[in-house]
């Protein structure tokens, strides 16, 4: 009975959906109890990167040999164990900067500027704006409608999600603004929707042909700063700054194919525009845009979005944030720094 719901089409028409839904979906409580239902099959989330004690430091251009204020503009950050990743969107100098923080201080390890995709040399196709790591793979989103994937040990290119041309075909995203991984899936916040890719489909030799598993409904299209973060139980929080909202998605509601899964019934609304969000354990943080020169950093209730504590303090324009190791990482776009706050 279940096979009528979804099948992975091996005889793919170019750039059409690999995962296609049946016209007649069978909801069967008996089978749901056996296989978990028609949603994503829950798998273990990589939590190894969350191990370690809290950190406290401020990273600046001075921590990168040879860099200048023109060549280093931190945009996004991700901490995995003792390794810190910073996406740099300085015009003409796009890169992923890698640092070691095992001593508690910041030591520059590598600048990822270009790589080989087979016999072709490549660079980031657009402004790098999101980064995460899961099960030995580094994912970096950029506005060029690609999410490049690298080996976390060798830094070699593995593949890319997206074709480099925006769209909603079977392999495409509409730009790409942020990424996270949870329960066996990669979640990309693009210009329109939340896009889902199975981690098992992210394999070498699949560049520009990693199949899109599913997409959400349209969250209203606009350029800007966006984020997606996963709660410990797998619930997804997705910003929509043009609507002053944070949408919640239950992974159990995600279905294969292009049917457009909807947000959870509860959404968090704000007077200001939410840009980025991050969980540190069960605590939720958000940056809220005030105007072109100022933003705020709040801890909020994951249930209703109410302010619990204002962390803006001496920061001027906190934008993209991330959390790991009982530490909140904050990119201040005004001072071009990354601040680690131990919690």
Q: Each PLM stretch: what is its role?
A:
Residues 1-48:
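N-terminal secretory leader/proregion of peptide precursors and effectors
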Residues 100-105, 151-155, 199-204, 250-255, ...:
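Short loop/turn segments that connect beta-strands within beta-propeller blades
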Residues 317-343:
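Blade-level signature of beta-propeller repeat domains, shared across WD40, Kelch, NHL, RCC1
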Residues 86-92, 140-145, 188-192, 238-243, ...:
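Conserved beta-strand positions in repeat-built beta-propeller and related beta-rich domains
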Residues 93-97, 146-149, 194-198, 244-250, ...:
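Structural motif
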Residues 44-69, 108-123, 158-171, 208-221, ...:
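Surface-exposed loop and turn segments in beta-propeller and other repeat-based domains
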Residues 83, 137, 185, 235, ...:
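Conserved core beta-strand positions within WD40 beta-propeller blades
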Residues 68-80, 115-133, 165-181, 219-232, ...:
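Beta-rich, blade/repeat-based domains predominating
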